[in-house]
Swiss-Prot record:
<keyword id="KW-0375">Hydrogen ion transport</keyword>
<keyword id="KW-0812">Transmembrane</keyword>
<comment type="similarity">
    <text>Belongs to the ATPase B chain family.</text>
</comment>
<feature type="transmembrane region" description="Helical">
    <location>
        <begin position="1"/>
        <end position="21"/>
    </location>
</feature>
<dbReference type="GO" id="GO:0045259">
    <property type="term" value="C:proton-transporting ATP synthase complex"/>
</dbReference>
<keyword id="KW-0472">Membrane</keyword>
<keyword id="KW-0406">Ion transport</keyword>
<protein>
    <recommendedName>
        <fullName>ATP synthase subunit b 2</fullName>
    </recommendedName>
</protein>
<keyword id="KW-0997">Cell inner membrane</keyword>
<comment type="function">
    <text>F(1)F(0) ATP synthase produces ATP from ADP in the presence of a proton or sodium gradient. F-type ATPases consist of two structural domains, F(1) containing the extramembraneous catalytic core and F(0) containing the membrane proton channel, linked together by a central stalk and a peripheral stalk. During catalysis, ATP synthesis in the catalytic domain of F(1) is coupled via a rotary mechanism of the central stalk subunits to proton translocation.</text>
</comment>
<dbReference type="InterPro" id="IPR050059">
    <property type="entry name" value="ATP_synthase_B_chain"/>
</dbReference>
<comment type="function">
    <text>Component of the F(0) channel, it forms part of the peripheral stalk, linking F(1) to F(0).</text>
</comment>
<keyword id="KW-0066">ATP synthesis</keyword>
<dbReference type="InterPro" id="IPR002146">
    <property type="entry name" value="ATP_synth_b/b'su_bac/chlpt"/>
</dbReference>
<keyword id="KW-0138">CF(0)</keyword>
<comment type="subunit">
    <text>F-type ATPases have 2 components, F(1) - the catalytic core - and F(0) - the membrane proton channel. F(1) has five subunits: alpha(3), beta(3), gamma(1), delta(1), epsilon(1). F(0) has three main subunits: a(1), b(2) and c(10-14). The alpha and beta chains form an alternating ring which encloses part of the gamma chain. F(1) is attached to F(0) by a central stalk formed by the gamma and epsilon chains, while a peripheral stalk is formed by the delta and b chains.</text>
</comment>
<keyword id="KW-1133">Transmembrane helix</keyword>
């Protein structure tokens, strides 16, 4: 019996002890448990990935909605600003038109007042000139006749 035989016997005894101790079953169970744990982790990872994709899709949808809403808000603000600008322009034009009309009325009033003042001055000047001419050229008898004629005209107009 040589050393190879004893090595073979030791190997057989070792294998019998390993089988008797149910080491292959323990190894199999351990590997099965590990495989189950890995499957479970893979399934959990797949579930998490699907949830992440759903969340990503939802965030993309919400972002698009937010962008659309922001665009609508900007468009609405632009419309309101344009309307306010047009209203301000219209109000300014009305104000300018009223001010121009008021200025034209004041100018017309000033012209009328100036014309009346010139006429009044002309009448006063004419009366003064006529008075001075009459004073130079009319004697007492002619003045009495003129006074009587004027008095008669006033009486005829009053009756």
């Amino acid at each position: 019996m040589d050393a190879t035989f004893w090595a073979f016997i030791a190997l057989v005894i070792f294998v019998v002890i390993v089988v008797y101790m149910k080491v292959p079953g323990m190894i199999g169970r351990t590997l099965d448990e590990r495989a189950d744990r890995i499957k479970k982790e893979l399934e959990e990872a797949r579930t998490l990935r699907e949830e992440a994709q759903q969340l990503l899709a939802e965030y993309h949808r919400k972002r698009k909605e937010a962008e659309k809403e922001a665009g609508d808000i900007v468009a609405s603000a632009e419309r309101e600003a344009k309307a306010l600008l047009e209203e301000a322009k219209r109000a300014t034009e009305e104000y300018v038109a009223r001010r121009n009309k008021l200025a034209e009325q004041k100018i017309a009033t000033a012209e009328t007042d100036a014309i009346n003042a010139v006429r009044a001055s002309a009448v006063d000047l004419a009366v003064a000139a006529a008075g001075s001419i009459l004073a130079e050229k009319v004697d007492a008898k002619a003045a009495g006749n003129l006074f009587n004629d004027a008095l008669a005209q006033v009486k005829s107009h009053l009756n």
